[in-house]
């Protein structure tokens, strides 16, 4: 393994780690702010955070990654580090189990449905926006 390759791998670990810290802190801060005005059993904070993450990950991988304006290490840091720690499948799963354990079946069903369908819709919107911006860049000659 070459020294350059080892250095790049170290850099990726550092970028993903720092981005992960920032993503986790952002999720925590946003979650706190949402729960200050939302006082119902439906886990709105986690749902909104995960939907935002779905949109931005799809947009990132469709638009930013294809533009070649950022090094792949930074794209990995943003996608895996920031967005990966910003979104939370485990919290979604635990909150769903808690709703079921409290016999809040309709809220659990609504939460799972909104999470899955909303995630697919937001990912689709992020992809569509990214694809639109790529095509716009191509027609304007900004794409490298």
From Swiss-Prot:
Gene Ontology cellular component list: plasma membrane
GO molecular function: fluoride channel activity; fluoride transmembrane transporter activity; metal ion binding
Keywords linked to the UniProt accession: Cell membrane, Ion channel, Ion transport, Membrane, Metal-binding, Sodium, Transmembrane, Transmembrane helix, Transport
GO biological process: cellular detoxification of fluoride; fluoride transmembrane transport
Predominant subcellular localization, coarse grouping: membrane
Localization per Swiss-Prot or TrEMBL: Cell membrane
Residue positions binding Na(+): 84, 87
TM helices/strands, residue ranges: 11-31, 44-64, 74-94, 107-127
Regulation: Na(+) is not transported, but it plays an essential structural role and its presence is essential for fluoride channel function.
Signal peptide start and end residues: none
Reaction catalyzed: fluoride(in) = fluoride(out)
Record membrane topology: Multi-pass membrane protein
Classification via InterPro entries: FluC
Sequence similarity: Belongs to the fluoride channel Fluc/FEX (TC 1.A.43) family.
Known function: Fluoride-specific ion channel. Important for reducing fluoride concentration in the cell, thus reducing its toxicity.
Protein name: Fluoride-specific ion channel FluC 1
Annotated organism of origin: Bacillus cereus (strain ATCC 14579 / DSM 31 / CCUG 7414 / JCM 2152 / NBRC 15305 / NCIMB 9373 / NCTC 2599 / NRRL B-3711)
């Amino acid at each position: 393994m070459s020294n350059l390759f080892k250095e790049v791998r170290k850099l990726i670990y550092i970028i993903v780690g720092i981005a992960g810290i920032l993503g986790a802190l952002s999720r925590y801060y946003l979650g706190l702010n949402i729960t200050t005005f939302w006082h119902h059993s439906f886990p709105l904070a986690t749902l909104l955070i995960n939907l935002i993450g779905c949109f931005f990950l799809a947009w990132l991988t469709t638009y930013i990654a294809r533009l070649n304006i950022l090094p792949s290490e930074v794209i990995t840091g943003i996608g895996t580090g920031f967005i990966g720690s910003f979104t939370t499948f485990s919290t979604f799963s635990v909150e769903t189990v808690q709703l079921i354990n409290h016999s809040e079946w309709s809220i659990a069903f609504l939460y799972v449905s909104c999470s899955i369908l909303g995630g697919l819709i937001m990912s689709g919107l992020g992809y569509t926006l990214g694809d639109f911006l790529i095509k716009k860049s191509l027609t304007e000659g900004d794409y490298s």
